[in-house]
């Protein structure tokens, strides 16, 4: 109900329960990765019907099959049925080759995602990482927000700067990083 609306206190929509979803899954029993068809089937079976508030697709260090994962997301995210949860993409660290490839994907699918999760935010280039990504999102006409992950004391020291950008609504603290 409207009287229970906590968005003014929480800074808007709260990401709530975020389910980590590897686009291409590894099967440790036989040491292989899913095929594209298996990954599509799993996505349609489980991701379409998630009860989580945010479905987080990882392209960063938890993702070994990056090119195939990007291809899967490019093909499948536009097919998602109407949903009542957010879709987030965890991208690779700022100014890396993989980050640039992630941006190429985002340019094509930004209308189908809600949040970019920036791993290791601010560790190398400070708040310029958020500033540049924010500017880039504006340049492509995107309404996607940024959720920085603070994983290092250096980033914690500049958390106020990371959060000062209008595209940042929430930050994540890496619980194993401190």
Explain the meaning of each model-derived region.
Residues 1:
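Short, Gly/Pro- and small/polar-rich lid/capping loops
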Residues 4, 9-178:
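Conserved alpha/beta-domain cores
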């Amino acid at each position: 109900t409207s009287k229970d609306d906590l968005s003014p206190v929480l800074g808007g929509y709260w990401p709530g329960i975020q389910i980590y979803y590897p686009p291409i899954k590894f099967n440790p029993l036989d040491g292989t990765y899913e095929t594209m068809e298996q990954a599509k089937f799993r996505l349609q079976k489980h991701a379409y019907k998630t009860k989580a508030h945010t479905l987080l697709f990882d392209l960063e260090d938890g993702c070994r099959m990056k090119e195939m994962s990007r291809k899967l997301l490019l093909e499948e995210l536009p097919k998602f049925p109407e949903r009542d949860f957010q879709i987030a993409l965890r991208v690779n660290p700022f100014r890396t080759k993989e980050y640039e490839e992630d941006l190429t994907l985002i340019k094509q699918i930004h209308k189908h995602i809600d949040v970019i999760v920036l791993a290791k935010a601010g560790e190398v280039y400070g708040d310029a990482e958020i500033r540049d990504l924010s500017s880039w999102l504006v340049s492509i006409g995107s309404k996607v927000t940024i959720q920085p992950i603070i994983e290092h004391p250096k980033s914690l020291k500049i958390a106020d700067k990371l959060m000062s950008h209008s595209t940042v609504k929430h930050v994540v603290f890496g619980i194993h990083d401190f």
